A protein has these predicted regions:
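Structured C-terminal subdomain patch of bacterial secreted/periplasmic proteins
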Residues: 31, 149, 160, 186, ...
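A short, structured surface patch at a secondary-structure boundary
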Residues: 51-108
């Protein structure tokens, strides 16, 4: 009899615990994201989804950083080196091939039966079609807000779906310290944000992939003085005469040719084109202050908004700027 009572008490305790857990674990959570009309605001999404479909590299970056990669059941083709474990072609069938970040394979998305689908701006037109399959989380970088703040907001939106907000706060506390170290090097300096592509140089607006240099680090982007930018992310063609006249203290060059693979198809390297006889007459060249983002070009071009991408970008800036600053200080002494 005592054994029966003990067993009944144990079962009751278990049921009470399960009930309490159910009461404290919500079925849905409200996050800040974009809706089908591209309006940023509150969106209700599933809490703790188990099956995740990802059609955006920045979102995949964040999901991986939060240790949630084992829940990814489908992904767009991956071109970012540190995310290749999620490449459908290399996953031995564990991850469905959902197409690309620009074009989703709707049939495959439906087949993998996701609880939630993450997309970026390139797939905004497919929001309604994807939403018919599963709830959609549409996140994008707001460059006017600043890439760091925007990345934090997006990472926190994803983290709050899984109860991992503290992980995001820890990451960004470390990022803030690194930015504080970099900021005095270029703050108030006249810089030129630019993009190299297929043997030509374009000027980049501040609200572009390179915005961290102007917005968060306080540099003055001379490119903004040249004209209006209809498509900031694509830049505007420039002439060497314009660059000579602007005479920047620093040049930052995002290498799109390398990011897209064109550099492997006979296109000249960025340095070969940019470091011509005219540019070599400028102090920015003589002082070694032309900074090329080549090694992680695809991160700068396609993954802005990911926390690991931000770590990579800060690493590139540290590697380029801190040695230059140390050299300049030594020369001044």
């Amino acid at each position: 009899m005592k054994k029966l009572v003990s067993l009944l008490l144990a079962v009751m305790c278990l049921l009470t615990a399960v009930s309490a857990f159910a009461e404290t674990t919500p079925a849905t959570v409200t996050i800040n994201a974009y809706n089908a009309e591209k309006v940023y605001g509150e969106v209700e999404v599933p809490y703790d989804p188990q099956r995740i479909a990802v059609l955006d590299m920045a979102a995949l970056d964040i999901i991986d950083a939060l240790g949630l990669g084992d829940r990814v059941v489908g992904s767009a083709k991956v071109t970012i080196e540190y995310l290749t474990d999620y490449n459908p072609d290399d996953s031995e069938g564990k991850i469905a091939n959902l197409g690309s970040v620009k074009t989703a394979d709707m049939e495959q998305v439906a087949i993998c039966e996701p609880d939630v689908i993450f997309i970026g701006g390139r797939l905004s037109k497919s929001y309604a079609d994807l939403e018919a399959i599963a709830p959609v989380v549409y996140l994008a970088v707001d460059y006017e807000k600043g890439v760091v703040q925007s990345t934090y907001d997006n990472a926190m939106a994803i983290a709050s779906m899984f109860g991992k907000e503290a992980d995001v706060d820890a990451l960004f506390t470390e990022f803030a310290g690194r930015i504080d170290t970099l900021k005095p090097i270029v703050e108030g300096k006249n810089v030129l944000l630019s993009m190299y592509n297929n043997n030509a140089l374009s000027l980049m607006a501040t609200n572009s992939q390179l915005s961290i240099i102007a917005n968060e680090m306080g540099a003055f982007n001379l490119s903004d003085t040249v004209g209006e930018y209809e498509k900031p992310a694509h830049g505007e063609d420039s002439s060497w005469e314009t660059i000579i006249n602007l005479n920047p203290e620093y040049m930052f060059v995002m290498d799109r040719s390398t990011a897209t693979g064109a550099a492997d198809e006979g296109v000249l390297g960025a340095r070969e084109v940019i470091e011509n006889d005219l540019v070599k007459e400028l102090d920015v060249y003589k002082n070694g202050q032309i900074v090329y983002f080549i090694e992680h070009a695809n991160v700068w071009y396609t993954s802005t908004g990911g926390v690991q991408a931000l770590d990579c970008m800060l690493g590139d800036l540290e590697g380029a700027l801190i040695p230059v600053e140390a050299t300049a200080e030594a020369a001044a002494e």
